Amino acid sequence: PNRHGGHGYTSPDVLEAGAKWAFSKGAGEVWIGDGPVWSMVGDSLNEYFRSSGLLDACERSGAKPLDFHAGEYRLFRPNHPDLPETIGFSEYLYQADVVISVPLMKTHFNTLVTLGIKNLKGCIRPADKLTFHTIELNAAIAEVNRLMAGLVTATVVDGSVAYEGMGPGGA
């Protein structure tokens, strides 16, 4: 997530509740993952998980924190002339039995709202993420969702906080 302007990311309380729910339904292991573009390596990512409350949510629920950028990427060739030649998706997604996307309900100055479809940008390579904001973002998001079709099992929107206005920074 882009953490300027306040709470612009999924509530740790919602993620904690979701992890506990998954365990109650028989999950043997639950991972809470993120791939923030501003925090790409080592200690800064650990600091992000701590400062955002994700680490505490993991500890309280028994889930494990997962850095989508710590592993390899599965590469795909997009079907859109304005997109990068390849787009990399975190390999961790393909190792999971179930993938649940939990986006915050918020507005966005480029896309009007961001829900499940834009939330998946956390799973792609940082360089690809940055490129998406220099091209037609809606087309990029649509292509990401086409390439990831069938990968996400469910999307649960976090409505505990909702943005109004020019988000995410000015909402």
Question: What are the roles of these predicted feature ranges?
Answer:
Residues 1-171:
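N-terminal and secondary-structure boundary signal
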